[in-house]
Amino acid sequence: MKTVTLSRLNAFKHAQEPFSCLTAYDASFAQHADAAGIDVLLVGDSLGMVLQGHASTLPVTLDDILYHTRCVARGKQRSLLMVDLPFMSNADTGQLLRDAGALMRAGAELVKIEGAGWMHEGVRELTRRGVPVCAHLGLTPQSVHQFGGYKVQGREQDDAQRIIDDARLLVEAGASVILLECVPAALGRAVRDAVDVPVIGIGAGPEVDGQILVMHDVIGVTHGRPPRFAKNFLAGRDSIQAAFEAYRDAVKTRQFPAEEHCF
């Protein structure tokens, strides 16, 4: 299988071929996901919840992210490696550049930033310096307290238009990828059509360019009630590898997400 690059993700978009993405936090699971043909691996600050047991992603530090990035970078071969900037890494431009540079040195190939249109100057500064950026819009978990919980975003027309406008602004500033979380399926489609870069969705409907899930949801080990957009692909299968392959195939054939996974 070919190595996945940003150019390849763009080719997937233009060919209308959905691509699969999955979180990974260590070398072993990265090897399994890579071998299963998962196109993008994300070292997400979700590790704060699924690995460290926190109630949110806010306590995750840059050192935490760097440790897991190095682990995943050693385990993967062909998948593109995307990595989260932790909470408040974008407090000012200097810190943003330093933290993003540290992630790239650790093995990141795409740096993900949560926020909204106000990030455009930071995105511009990063891309000027050769750091590829994924802009995370919609439900941004680092803003959970501002949102008042993990709630679907963009239900109202004004909010939906703001997200579309933010996506356009951030792509104009240089963002290479947009990630949409927990928005109505119609908004996912609208953002996909509004920008010429790949749009990855998690709870954003079936008509975005790629899908991402947290690995723990895919193999059914999430504590408590799983999110609506998740599916246990290990159920009825005998290995984690088979679960990852089933997820990949379901995304490629547009069988996932189904209507019950959408807002």
Curated annotation (Swiss-Prot):
UniProt keyword list: Cytoplasm, Magnesium, Metal-binding, Pantothenate biosynthesis, Transferase
Binding site for 3-methyl-2-oxobutanoate: D45, S46, D84, K112
Cofactor note: Binds 1 Mg(2+) ion per subunit.
Cofactor(s) in the UniProt record: Mg(2+)
GO MF entry, a single one: 3-methyl-2-oxobutanoate hydroxymethyltransferase activity
Cell compartment(s), UniProt: Cytoplasm
A Pfam short name: Pantoate_transf
Residues reported in the UniProt entry to bind Mg(2+): D45, D84, E114
Enzyme's top EC category: transferase
EC number(s) reported in the record: 2.1.2.11
GO biological process: pantothenate biosynthetic process
InterPro entries: Pantoate_hydroxy_MeTrfase, Pyrv/PenolPyrv_kinase-like_dom, Pyrv_kinase-like_dom_sf
Cell inner membrane as UniProt keyword: no
Pathway: Cofactor biosynthesis; (R)-pantothenate biosynthesis; (R)-pantoate from 3-methyl-2-oxobutanoate: step 1/2
Summary of subunit composition and partner proteins: Homodecamer; pentamer of dimers.
Protein family according to the UniProt entry: Belongs to the PanB family.
Xref: HAMAP family: PanB
Biological role: Catalyzes the reversible reaction in which hydroxymethyl group from 5,10-methylenetetrahydrofolate is transferred onto alpha-ketoisovalerate to form ketopantoate.
Protein name in the entry: 3-methyl-2-oxobutanoate hydroxymethyltransferase
Species annotation: Chromohalobacter salexigens (strain ATCC BAA-138 / DSM 3043 / CIP 106854 / NCIMB 13768 / 1H11)
